[in-house]
Amino acid sequence: VTPKVLQPEELKNYWRDIKPGLEKVLLNTPTASWIPEDVYSAIQNRKAICVLGIEEEEVVGFFVGYPQANSFFAWAVWSQGDLSEGINHLLWYAKEVGCRKVIFQSDRKGWARVLRKYNAYPHTWVMEV
């Protein structure tokens, strides 16, 4: 799998591959407060970055996010198969843009299992009032 940093002017060409992945992320994350079109707008307006995973000219995964201070906030991560390679690309990209850590928020319990081998730890606690 080869990572490809998507340029905003290329987004229309790849949206048919990205949107279904975002919809799958949303199906598994019922507390998410965004829709795929929010992601489209953020990429198009250079507020977010999308890195595709390309294999044999096909999109097999992607992540969307943005740098903030010394961290890279991963907004959405999707892969057709094992997430390990995509996570490795995410860590590589974060380092490339000068970030020292990757952060994201999810209420999906499966992330604890996936991220254990990366020495990741829970980062956000929420108290509703």
Language model features: what each stretch is:
Residues 9-16, 20, 37, 81-88, ...:
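Generic alpha-helical secondary structure signal
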Residues 1-34:
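Short amphipathic alpha-helix that is part of the acyltransferase structural core
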Residues 121-129:
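Conserved catalytic-core motifs of GNAT/GCN5-like acyltransferases
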Residues 22, 26, 43, 90-98:
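Hydrophobic, Leu/Ile/Phe/Ala-enriched alpha-helical segments that form helix-helix packing faces
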Residues 69-118:
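Acyl-donor binding region in acyl/amide transferases
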Residues 44-82:
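Conserved donor-binding loop and adjoining core beta-sheet/short helix segment
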Residues 2-7, 85-86, 128:
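Short, solvent-exposed coil/turn linker segments
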Residues 29-48:
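Active-site rim helix/loop that mediates acceptor-substrate recognition in acyltransferases
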